[in-house]
Regions:
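N-terminal [4Fe-4S]-dependent radical SAM core
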Residues: 2, 17-20, 171-229
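Radical SAM enzyme core and accessory elements
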Residues: 2-7, 17, 56, 78-81, ...
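Radical SAM [4Fe-4S] cluster-binding motif and immediate context
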Residues: 199-369
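A structural motif corresponding to the C-terminal lobe/cap of the Radical SAM core domain
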Residues: 3-11, 82-83, 102, 258-259, ...
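Generic structural signal for well-ordered alpha-helices
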Residues: 43, 47, 74-78, 99-103, ...
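Glycine-rich beta-alpha loop elements in corrinoid/cobalamin-binding modules
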Residues: 42, 49-53, 58-189
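Short glycine-rich His-centered loop
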Residues: 3-35
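Conserved alpha-helical elements of sugar-nucleotide-dependent glycosyltransferases
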Residues: 35-45
Length: 568
């Protein structure tokens, strides 16, 4: 059966295998690599929704394929693909280089095919995207499943009119941009993501192509999955492009819409049929209220699966709530991101709680049986000086000391990089928060991403730190934290030495690249590629530390196949 739509996910930089780029510690605290190969969960939702409407949809993670196989020819692969419509996600801004380069290749070999962009960044930069001749349509918003179906009906079945599809921006036959009303903002999302994980398993079997559906390079070794609870957010974190303010201004969503507790558990059960790996329930369950959180946790307790859970807090929690987490998800992992040790900085960025409240929550989480407790801090915040960022590392030492070296406690810090999110309060109101936005256009961000050093991809400075200070402070703070991990035996001496070697080599390389860039010596920069690539591919201690030890049998292919056959 022919394919109607192929959804492509690009690497952050299309030709990352050829360019000399020192990526820095920009992806150390997330599952994907510096190529940001993870595709948004919206692709699986769209594929499943369109599948129920009778369309044949395929997902291809080009980024993973390019990472896993140095000889993989992305252009030749795209040339062989056949479909009347291609879709490319530009959700996270870090994909703005790769996504557009992939678009050019698609149109080069499939000039008659229609090309659609979608995602948060596509929504924000929709006007600039349609200036590229390769892009025919942009679907705006956080819930484009139904508009996408209507667009497929128009293009494939010649039913309906483009002018009547909500959220669509498109080019007419004369090349003029037409902007339809941005009005499809569903307040009920229980008709999407009904069986999207099951649909992925079915598609893998159908296309005999597991690698194209894997979200990250090492997923087969560490099969972590995610479950979302809502679209939108209740919080207003200054640095986040997914804040309540950003959703109102950029995505037309006045308030978040939540999936039913039953839908959340349905996802968990779908995942448990094919994977024994950890499940990350994204977002603070209390966003929809304490009753909603209790319902989800009660259902998790009643529908027990063997997978380990990673849960998230946006702000401190009561011991009773943490105990409920422990009963529902034994040996759960917990994450919280205060971002700074300084309560005044936390208040400015949207974390208005005291250090005493934070510390009480950490104590209580350990007391009720939390298996691992991850605390995240950040560099590049309003009112944060280099000294303040270093003092945050000292505060990490204080937290480790007061936990008496409990090895369940892990501290992390990283720079706000590569971008301050377009749409975030800091990006939209920089003067208020002390940010200096260095580039605003989509094309400026694209060029910056391809710079030889991560310093030059930063789209901001602050009243308190230059880009150079952000780079230097980041390396110094991470090195200090690395030493604390050794002191409290959180990581091994060997891993710490590897981490220090990587960080110091990267810091020194950033200085060498600065010097060569000041001389405009591009040939010398190109000669450094083997050394830069070696630094980029060093083991990352933080990624290793963040992994939940998976069981020996990580995936359940026969159980997944049986589930597809029987529907159980």
């Amino acid at each position: 059966m022919s394919t109607d739509l192929i959804l492509l996910h690009a690497p952050s930089i299309y030709d990352f295998r050829k360019k000399t780029i020192l990526y820095g510690p920009v992806s150390d605290l997330i599952p994907p690599s510096y190529v940001f190969e993870m595709y948004p969960i919206g692709l699986t939702s769209i594929a499943e929704y369109l599948g129920r409407a009778g369309y044949q949809v395929r997902i291809v993670n080009l980024a993973v394929r390019m990472l896993r196989d140095g000889k993989f020819d992305a252009e030749a692969f795209i040339k062989r693909l056949k479909a009347p419509i291609f879709g490319i996600d530009l959700h996270w801004m870090v994909h703005c280089h790769g996504s557009i380069e992939i678009a050019k290749i698609v149109k080069k070999w499939h000039p008659e095919a229609k090309l659609i962009f979608g995602g948060f960044s596509s929504t924000y930069f929709y006007k600039e995207l349609l200036e590229y001749p390769e892009i025919d349509y942009v679907l705006r918003g956080d819930s484009t499943e139904e508009p996408f179906r209507q667009l497929m009906d128009c293009v494939i079945r010649h039913k309906g009119e483009l002018e009547k599809i909500a959220n669509l921006v498109w080019k007419d036959n004369h090349g003029k941009i037409q902007e339809n009303p941005f009005s499809h903002i569903p307040t009920d999302i229980n008709n999407v993501m009904v069986n999207h994980y099951g649909n992925v398993v079915r598609s893998v079997i159908k296309h005999r192509d597991l690698i194209s559906y894997t979200p990250v390079k090492d997923w087969l070794r560490y099969p972590i999955t995610a479950v979302i609870t809502c679209r939108g957010c209740t919080e207003n974190c200054v640095i986040c492009g997914g804040s309540a303010a950003a959703f109102r201004k950029c995505y037309n969503r006045g308030k978040p819409v939540f999936r039913s507790p039953e839908a959340v558990i349905r996802d968990v059960r779908q995942i448990s049929r094919f994977s024994n790996g950890p499940i990350f329930i994204l977002g603070d369950l209390r966003q929809a209220g304490e009753d909603y959180a209790s319902q989800v946790l009660n259902l998790l307790q009643k529908n027990r699966v063997k997978n380990q859970f990673i849960l998230e807090l946006f702000y401190p929690a009561s011991k009773d709530f943490l105990r409920q987490m422990s009963l529902a998800c034994p040996d759960f992992c917990l994450e919280i991101s205060p971002e700074s040790h300084d309560p005044e900085i936390r208040k400015v960025i949207g974390r208005p709680y005291s250090s005493q409240e934070l510390e009480q929550t950490l104590d209580d989480a350990l007391d009720v049986g939390c298996r691992r407790l991850d605390v995240f801090f950040m560099i590049g915040l309003p009112r944060q000086t280099p000294q303040s960022a270093i003092e945050t590392t000292d505060y990490c030492g204080h937290l480790l000391e007061r936990s008496r070296g409990d090895k369940r406690v892990s501290m992390f810090t990283s720079p706000l990089a590569p971008f301050l999110d377009p749409g975030s309060l800091g990006f939209e109101n920089p003067e208020r928060y002390g940010y200096h936005i260095l580039f605003r256009k989509l094309e400026e961000h694209r060029r910056a991403l391809a710079s030889p050093s991560w310093k030059y991809s930063l789209n901001y400075e602050t009243d308190w730190m230059t880009r150079q200070q952000i780079v230097d402070t980041s390396y110094e703070a991470i090195l200090r934290l690395n030493q604390l991990r050794v002191k409290y035996e959180i990581i091994s001496e060997k891993l710490a030495q590897t981490s220090e070697q990587r960080l110091r080599a990267a810091w020194e390389m950033s200085r060498r690249l600065d010097d060569l860039l000041s001389k405009n010596d591009n040939e010398a920069i190109d000669r450094l590629k083997p050394e830069v690539d070696r630094i980029n591919t060093f083991p990352v201690a933080e990624k290793i530390q963040l992994e939940v030890p998976p069981p020996f049998i990580k995936l359940k292919p026969f159980r997944a196949l049986w589930s597809l056959v029987t529907g159980r």
